[in-house]
């Protein structure tokens, strides 16, 4: 925390964001959501897309600020357009669930694809859901299995659960209850 503070005092945006994460989550210091938001805001204003995404999440869930889902989407979009994979995934999820915007599965799948192209695990998994159920693109269960497998191999637990279900009921693969149980345990 001390070194992040020293670097943040020198206006280093990444350090401001990391110090904000320390305050938000109580890493090495007492939690202080207001300080976290102030640091994210300062780093965002300095043009640091990951901080812009973190600030968006604060607005989405009300960490240190009033919930403002529309503002969250605006911040996610700004960071997503700067190629921030986490923001692309979060923006896709907003479209997927209609959070701060009208639900739009096609937009969701497009943003998930952009983040998945950067190997962002959650986006790979969510893109798999889009393919499995035909949300926003043509249904392709084989592609869904490939994406779930990739996300699982990258260490994303929900992908193991979805893959386990595919093996349990035979969605896109032969039924294999032993493999299903193994995947559920890994999840």
Functional labels for PLM-detected ranges:
Residues 1-10, 15, 38, 42-45, ...:
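Low-complexity/repetitive intrinsically disordered segments
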């Amino acid at each position: 925390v001390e070194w992040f503070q020293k670097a943040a005092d020198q206006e280093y945006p990444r350090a401001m964001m990391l110090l904000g994460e320390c305050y938000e989550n109580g890493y090495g210091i007492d939690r202080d959501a207001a300080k976290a938001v102030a640091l994210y805001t300062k780093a965002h204003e300095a043009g640091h897309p990951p901080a812009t995404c973190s600030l968006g999440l604060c607005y989405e869930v009300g960490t240190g600020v009033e919930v403002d889902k529309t503002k969250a989407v605006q911040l996610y979009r700004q960071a997503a357009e700067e190629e921030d994979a986490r923001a692309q995934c979060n923006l896709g999820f907003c479209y997927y669930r209609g959070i701060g915007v009208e639900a739009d599965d096609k937009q969701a799948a497009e943003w998930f694809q952009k983040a998945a192209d950067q190997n962002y695990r959650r986006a790979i998994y969510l893109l798999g859901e889009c393919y499995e159920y035909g949300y926003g693109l043509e249904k392709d269960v084989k592609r869904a299995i490939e994406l779930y497998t990739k996300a699982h191999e990258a260490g994303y637990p929900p992908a193991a659960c979805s893959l386990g279900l595919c093996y349990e009921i035979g969605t896109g693969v032969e039924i294999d209850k032993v493999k299903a149980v193994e995947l559920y345990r890994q999840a």
